[in-house]
Amino acid sequence: SLVQCAKKKNVHLLTGHHRRHNKIIREAKDTIDSGQLGRLVTSHSMCWLFKPNDYFNSWRESISGGPVLINLTHDIDLMRYLIGEIESVHSFESNANRKGKVEDSAVVSLRFKNGTIGTLSISDTIVAPWSWEHTSGENPIYPNQKESCYWIGGTHGSLELPKLKSWKSLNERSWWEPIQSNQSPTDNNINQPLSAQLDNFISVVQGKEEPVCSGEDGLKTLLVIEAIKLSATIGK
């Protein structure tokens, strides 16, 4: 494989999952890794959007062209980056709306190796604001809806992304006690992750940094995506 070849030749192999380079994601990872949320318990991710008919040329209607392979791979990579490695998945797919050869919607249950469990849903047939494309402001082609699309919860707090809105107890941790929110400022984000990704690439070539997303990271995310497709096919 490419990963094995790169290791054998002692060269770096990078994967273009640009969302990892987003300063919002970097701050979220710092928050999680610092233990501010406590022990992670569960997560929920949404990618709901509506793709117009002229989006679907022939290859996007084929078995390799659905939103799980095209879009969900980025969400899975971020969950791995923020929460940890994924141990098992169970998924359902549907093509009930577009009635094509490939799925238009899917839901996935995730179990992470650290004990966190999560859910994820994706559809390209829903008119909605809850997707990374519409909420992050990374790409100006997508109208920014200023909503969240990822939620990560722990024993001492929870976090919404990309709003960077955190929630924690004021006093005792109890559903009878008040909780408060704090939202970190998020600056103009247009194209920032792509330039940061290029900076990392240059620094890796110069021997100054390690890859933010290695070839092995890309392979691990791809293996999760393949497991999601297999689970939907065999019903396990």
Role assignments for model-derived ranges:
Residues 22, 73-80, 192-199, 216-223:
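A structural signal for well-ordered alpha-helical segments within the folded catalytic domains
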Residues 11-15, 19-110, 131-132, 235:
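Predominantly a Rossmann-like dinucleotide-binding segment in NAD(P)-dependent oxidoreductases
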Residues 99-103, 113-196:
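NAD(P)-dinucleotide binding in Rossmann-like oxidoreductases
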Residues 8, 161-162, 200-236:
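C-terminal helix-rich "cap/oligomerization" subdomain common to oxidoreductases
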